[in-house]
Amino acid sequence: MPISIAEAILQGANKLRKAGVPEARREAGSLLAFLLDKDRTFILSHADDPISEEQETLFQEFLDSRALGEPAQYITGRQDFYGLEFEVTPAVLIPRPETELLIEAAIKLVGTEEKVSFCDVGTGSGCIAITLLTQFPQAHAIAIDVSTEALGIAKRNAARHRVTDRIEFVLSDCFASVPQQTFDLIVSNPPYVAEDAVATLQREVRDFEPRVALTAGADGLDVIRRLVTDAQRYLQHNAHLLFEIGFDQHEAVGNLVDAQVWELLDIHQDLQGIPRTVALRRR
């Protein structure tokens, strides 16, 4: 006998709760809404509607994956970022709300100058570069990643948001394979987790997100060191370098900055008051 939407969510929430998944009811409802291709308003207003046996079976598969710790974003293959929807797979980091600070900081730095060229280092899903291109219709970007699989996802997201003609994708370890040129802005959400901190991460992050996009050496600063050193060759004078950092890294990052090369403009905090984004200007 078919079960109703409400019954499916209740059973799903109980299963996820037993598996230690936070906000189990919300997650169960979101997974069912995705499966039914409906929004949460529909789910709430049609709680007594039945779901088919096929839908129930698929929903149970979703729940099984989520109960094992797989992020919902990988199960559904999508994540919202700055009002846009992006395809995500285990080949790319899941875009986070705190990374939207990079977008806001970049918009503030660029101001009214729309004809900008910028580089996104470690583009992953492409969410940063693509979002900035939608904000600046005359901008052009180069998006770099060390992962072929990640670049494939980013290319599909660029096509989805119709910016393919304004973005070039480069397979490169930082700037190693990037032809010499200068940009108005370099932006990055680099890996910054210390190797010995991996065990402390949530299982959704630790066991499912790509390690290459998370960790960067013993102190988590290996990639940021390269970024601060190498970016100066790719920036015009008075151009900007903008990147995300870990919650406890602002002092260490400040010590990496050569004052003869860079002016430290700001370290932006997130809504919890945690330093998240560093803004530098090339002298």
Set out the residue ranges of the language-model regions.
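Non-catalytic accessory regions of SAM-dependent methyltransferases
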Residues: 1-44, 51
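Conserved hydrophobic residues forming the short capping helix/wall of the S-adenosyl-L-methionine
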Residues: 16, 110, 158, 231, ...
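Residue-level signal for inorganic ion chemistry
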Residues: 31, 69, 99, 128, ...
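Conserved AdoMet
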Residues: 32-108
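Conserved SAM/SAH cofactor-binding pocket of Class I
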Residues: 97-200
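Helix-to-beta-strand junctions that scaffold the AdoMet/dcAdoMet cofactor pocket
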Residues: 163, 209, 235-237
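Mobile active-site "lid"/loop adjacent to the S-adenosyl-L-methionine
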Residues: 192-223
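Conserved Class I SAM-dependent methyltransferase catalytic core
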Residues: 218-280
